[in-house]
Amino acid sequence: MKQIVTCKEMKALDGNMIEEIGIPSCVLMERAALKVAEELERTLADKKQEERILCVCGSGNNGGDGVAVARILKLHGYRTSLYLVGNPDHRTVEMQRQLDIAAACQVPVVNNLETEEYTTIVDAIFGVGLSRPVEGSYRDVIMALNQLNAWKVAVDIPSGVNGDTGAELGIAFHADLTVTFAFRKAGLCLYPGRKFAGKVIVADVGIYASDKVKPYLWQTEKTDIHFLPDKIVDGNKGTFGKILVVAGSPGMCGAAYLSASGAFAVGIGMVKIVTAEENRIPLQTMLPEAMLDCGDDFAKDLDWCDIVVIGPGIGTTYQAAEKVQWFLEAASGAAKPVILDADGLNLLAQHPEWKQYLTSRVVMTPHMGEMGRLTGKTVKELQTDRIAAARELAAETGAVCVLKDACTVTAAPDGNTWISLAGNPGMATAGSGDVLTGILAGVLAMFLNKRTELPDTGRQAALGVLLHGMAGDLAAKEKGTAGMKAGDIVRGASEVLKNK
């Protein structure tokens, strides 16, 4: 897992290197420019003579990075020009210093974007500190750059992207490549910022973590899947976890089937489904590996299991509400982990007094619509800051929040937060969330064995989200995103674990 930073944290880390360690800001700027130039040359070296590079620079230190990039590339034999945006009177000391050096190196400055047919555009207008909408001449320039038929590279972050939320601040530069410094910024992980960034390379420029900045944001990576423990050789089906799936209203057995299938796909030992009598025959036919209970001896069921899944396809009737409340309260009293999903969340939104049953061992998995019902906010409001939304709900309830979206955010009650970059548009299909619920339950079950180091529930949930995303990516390779179904993700999960 790699640390992600907010704009405020990046500023503090940058300041620590300058003020506490004593590295001059001009040295850090030179390192940053060298890294950008290296990435450009890695792609452009074979066509140096044909390249026409334009570095578009603002008045701040991000602009200074861009000016230094232009100078380095010119000295390496590339035809490079500068285009300056913004008020010259507002230039930072470092930006002006870089302009003076560039002038001494005879880097040309152009006054018109159409002076040449540029093959590469370097965006260094705004850095990560931008929080206001892009307006006026800045907007006009970014709009013109986006229309150019050229390879586009952003310095640290595409201009116009909020570095914390990924929001588009009026207009944003559309990069093919973003070279960001020291740490990936949160806004490069979340849409639409992730889309505007293109491929992201995190460059080491000599800025490192500091005790003065306590990390709380993390990006899960494919290699993290190795943290999931293997099955022990002397185990049995009881050792590998018993999951109770409380799901499926009469005639609605698909969600229960997919949740149970997701759990089996990641190695769970036993699954029992508590569901309506009408679902007995189809579930026994589709998933004979699962046990079924269509009665009402809930206490026996709860005593049997290790982990409870509550909600998929259960409905929001009075009878469903009674069942969900009973299991939430009883699981809380028994200190058993719970995955609360779908209609379980919709019923929680209708009965906020049930939040008293939520603990740090409960994982809620709302999509944006369910999150809106839980928080009273519109989807548009939630999308302005997904990280804050997930963290606030986790802090309020004391439970883990897995906020499902194109980039899923997992937040623990203590504030630690994980973002998954795995997954693809093909996973936006009916039943995908039910599969995730089963996978999450299965992952939590992996850590029940006391021979395995036990991470907190938030970290376990983040690993489950990663596994789900990787399974979807594997399914997309085989099926394509257009034809994927939830069952393909189930099969993908087993393959991911097989090859880890």
Please tell me what each predicted stretch does.
Residues 115-119, 172, 302-303, 357-358:
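A short, aliphatic-rich alpha-helical micro-motif
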Residues 98-99, 138-142, 175, 324, ...:
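Amphipathic alpha-helical segments in well-structured domains
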Residues 68-146, 281-293, 299-300:
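N-terminal small/polar loop signature for handling phosphorylated ligands or for N-terminal nucleophile
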